[in-house]
């Protein structure tokens, strides 16, 4: 299977401008990671898979966001995926407001649609409601995005899935002190 990733720099919807503020996207292509710069506006990532026929479903979506600024900077935003197979740019999935000053890893089992293998997979990835004290062009975070393709002879849809948080920096730090206290109490009673 020959997989090609390309970046297209043209507005898909003049009413909506994506603000990614000069960040980088790392896309896994086979065994190699390819780094693609995210532009301040009109960022559109498309995937083309060269196959003889059939339908593609995107499965096991994994996203890791690593901050490149101070935690106290107050950088936040919502991560979304959009379907641009029609002109409305229907929002497929959107997270809650994320604190982008802390590392976070998200996963989703699948996207709930399939498309012809002869066309581009119509997924737009980006951030909205992005709040940052920095000027445009400053790298705020790096994003790594990985997924697998599910192939089928027939077109079908899957039940809706939600983002799950695999890892969140502060959540793990909050658990560590309580585990240490419990361990020390049991040790002293022995």
UniProtKB/Swiss-Prot annotation:
GO BP, one annotated term: transport of virus in host, cell to cell
Gene Ontology CC terms: host cell membrane; membrane; viral capsid
Keyword Membrane annotated: yes
Pfam families named in the record: TBSV_P22
Gene Ontology terms, MF aspect: RNA binding
Cellular compartments annotated: Host membrane
Superkingdom assignment: Viruses
Keywords noted in UniProt: Host membrane, Membrane, RNA-binding, Transport, Viral movement protein
Entry keyword Disulfide bond: no
Family of this protein: Belongs to the tombusvirus/aureusvirus movement protein p22 family.
Job of this protein: Transports viral genome to neighboring plant cells directly through plasmosdesmata, without any budding. The movement protein allows efficient cell to cell propagation, by bypassing the host cell wall barrier.
Protein known as: Movement protein
